[in-house]
A protein has these predicted regions:
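Extreme N-terminal, non-catalytic leader segments
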Residues: 2-25
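Hydrophobic anchor at the beta1->P-loop junction of P-loop NTPases
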Residues: 28
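A conserved segment at the C-terminal end of the G1
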Residues: 37-49
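PAPS-dependent sulfation machinery
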Residues: 53-148
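Conserved phosphate-donor/acceptor-positioning beta-strand/loop module used by diverse small-molecule
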Residues: 151-154, 161-186
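A glycine- and Lys/Arg-enriched "phosphate-lid" helix/loop adjacent to the NTP-binding pocket
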Residues: 172, 181-206
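The conserved 3'-phosphoadenosine-5'-phosphosulfate
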Residues: 183-186, 192, 217-286
Length: 286
């Protein structure tokens, strides 16, 4: 089967005009708290895709691969942050450790980082592409899958840079009622971090949406599908939304994936209209 590692040389900058067969690399992103993990779990049940278990983030965060390619961050600093932050770090707001340490062995991390630093000066794009696949593609290979899903929220916001680096990639932008996103984000922060109020949450959501719009314009609308979580979990567009997601990803009918969708993806699990719990009833009509 063809893998990302089979094409790890410096990529062509040709523009993808739209889906053609199953995607080998699918980025699922959004504002955060918009349903990216729900969509990734559905597609992970297919025969084709394996999802990265959590957000890898080294290709989307400040100081990550886009900043390295743009010259805003040096390769040595990137390598340091990869080893000491993205690999494993403690997040106070969630009171837990996060990072790629859960599925990337330390030996693989060191080998990939060493190769990246050795190659970057002569072939910066190829080095950035290679370290992504060196770290993450083994997940697909171990699962005998031909496609990989990465679900860092900012993948669509960074689609301009990622689209050049990975010309084979497609982007799913998961959208959700901004009021529910804001309420979920405030609840996630537990008042320990910004945003702490619904208004701050809405401002946060708006800023993220504007960044995503820039990313979509940069990569081209033909490589991005906007997918409504609200339509996916309920209503008369549920099946249509599922089908558009499946077809954009290049998948045919898949009994395992469809069975999971029918059993597990329901409005009761999506916390629709959660924002009403955070906003006094007298203000809900504003």
């Amino acid at each position: 089967m063809t893998t990302g590692l089979d094409t790890e040389a410096a990529p062509s900058h040709a523009t993808d005009t739209g889906p053609s067969g199953p995607a080998s690399l699918l980025f699922v992103g959004g504002t955060g708290r918009s349903g990216t993990h729900v969509v990734s779990k559905i597609l992970d049940k297919s025969e084709h895709f394996r999802k990265v278990p959590n957000e890898a983030r080294f290709h989307t965060d400040p100081g990550g691969l886009p900043d390295v390619l743009a010259g805003r961050t040096g390769p040595d600093l990137f390598a340091y942050r990869l080893r000491h932050h993205w690999y494993r770090n403690f997040e106070p707001a969630r009171l837990t450790f996060r990072g790629i340490h859960r599925y990337v062995p330390r030996r693989r991390l060191e080998a990939a980082t060493t190769s990246f630093l050795r190659r970057f000066e002569d072939e910066p794009e190829a080095a950035c592409r290679q370290i992504f696949f060196d770290l993450l593609w083994p997940l697909a290979a171990e699962g005998h899958k031909a496609g990989l899903i990465e679900q860092s929220c900012d993948t669509v916001a960074q689609a301009g840079a990622l689209g050049l680096l990975f010309p084979e990639a497609r982007f799913l932008h998961v959208v959700r009622d901004g009021r529910d996103v804001a309420a979920s984000r405030v609840g996630q922060a537990r008042f320990l971090a910004h945003p702490r109020t619904m208004q701050q949450g809405l401002d946060w959501w708006e800023g993220r949406i504007r960044r995503i719009d820039v990313g979509v314009r940069a990569v081209g609308a033909g490589r991005v599908l906007a997918l409504s979580l609200d339509d996916l979990v309920s209503g008369n567009r549920r099946r249509e939304t599922y089908r558009s997601m499946r077809e954009f990803s290049g998948l045919g009918n898949d009994a395992s994936m469809e069975g999971y969708f029918e059993r597990r993806v329901r409005v009761r699990n999506a916390h629709a209209e959660r924002w009403r719990e955070e906003v006094p009833e007298r203000r809900q009509a504003e």
